[in-house]
Amino acid sequence: LDIPYTGGNPQCLSYCYDKSLVRGIAKEIGIPVPQAFFVNPMDSTFDVTIDFPVLVKPNFGDSSFGITRNSVANSAEELLQAITDIRKKFGYEKPILVEELLTGKDLTLGIIGTPPGSFQTLPVSEEDYSMLPPELPRICGYEAKWQPDSPYWSIKSVRAELPPDTEKALVEWSVKLSERLECRDYTRFDWRLDAAGIPRLLEVNPNPGWCWDGHLAKMAAMGGMSYSDMLGAIIKSAEERILMEYGANIRMKEINMRQEIAV
């Protein structure tokens, strides 16, 4: 349709919504990820190659669909039940990713702009689980985002307090991933610290929610940016990018025309 738009292109979205693919790309460029293994569609047997507890999630998708308190498994029996639950809800033809359950700080970092061009990083935010009943696993899944009557709705986002080296790594790795995956205009990166305090990539979110109470808006507010200014910055990034792409296309057409005339 040739209609300009903000955010990632179809290729970027298809890459980022494949969690195992993003993991592979991250590892390839030296970015830490949780230990994990893959369960193929219709597999009835598989090797458990990591220690419990684990987090079971659909390999494809976004918005935490399929990730609930029941996605945390502390035994083989609970793992099989979690896999069965996902297959019943999302289909037996869908692959499943099983990751080690990290319990360090649960972090997210936002970028507005398009690296390596003009961009700005937003303050790192942390999920505050202090109001969550102690018996529930500390994860920010579907219940925290879509079910107001859930105890997970009590989770708050606060500005993260991190060692300078850790924050520096988060920014550098997020920018590196943004470039490699060709994310554009606005992106959010989810991380979690391991037992040694090392950030490990959970997910890359191209075109993350920009609603007024979403993570991106909260991080922008932490950095002193109003909601309208955040939206304006996203649109400005897209305008600058589209103008550059348009100019490059015009120049290429001019070159092709000259070559045709010369022939």
Can you say where each PLM-predicted feature lies in the sequence?
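N-terminal glycine-rich "phosphate-gripper" loop used for MgATP/nucleotide binding
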Residues: L1
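Phosphate-binding site of ATP-dependent enzymes
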Residues: A76-D165, A195-R200
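Short beta->alpha connector loops at strand-helix junctions that form conserved
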Residues: G8-Q11
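Hydrophobic beta-strand scaffold residues
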Residues: P4-Y5, V33, V54, Y227
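Active-site nucleotide/adenylate-binding loops and adjacent lid/helix of ATP-dependent enzymes
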Residues: L13-L97, T103-K105, P115-P116
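ATP-dependent carboxylate activation and anion-phosphoryl transfer catalytic cores
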Residues: K27-I31, E161-V263
